[in-house]
Amino acid sequence: MSSKFGNQCGKTQKIYIRNELINPDIEFSVPNSIFSCIGPKYAYASLQSIVVKYTPVITERSTGSIGISVSDRRFSASEVVSNISLDTSSKANLMISGFSCCPLEEGCPYTITISTKLEGVNYGAAVGSLVVSPSFRLSNEPIPTTGITYQMIKLGDVQKTYQGVAITDEKK
């Protein structure tokens, strides 16, 4: 079973992780319209980073794990570019970065899939919440990347936003 929650215009979204009979995958796709609402003055766009903030409800024992996978729809839909697992009992702030850029008119090709593996928790019980925040970078030249990386971070840096979306404006 799969549940898809559209991340409208790439805005921050909060999801409660629950123990369900069938654990759904939750996919975040940034629609092409996110780039068109910013304006056509740039040639390239890059999903600069995605910040995933996990806050557990149950901290005294581990109840399983949360898997975070990155897919690139320019390749096979089932091909996972990168993935990481988080323990459900620990608070985590994770930044995923290093996404390749693409021409502005093509839109964002990346999908983030959140999957859960939970045990020892009553059916329907929440084990924590995820807040997922994308950040974009716009440029008139291709933006070099080093490949997708994961980094545990401290939150608190305030970024410039447009309709709830963090944006780095790079004029050339």
Curated annotation (Swiss-Prot):
Protein name: Protein 3
Taxonomy of the source species: Viruses, Riboviria, Orthornavirae, Negarnaviricota, Haploviricotina
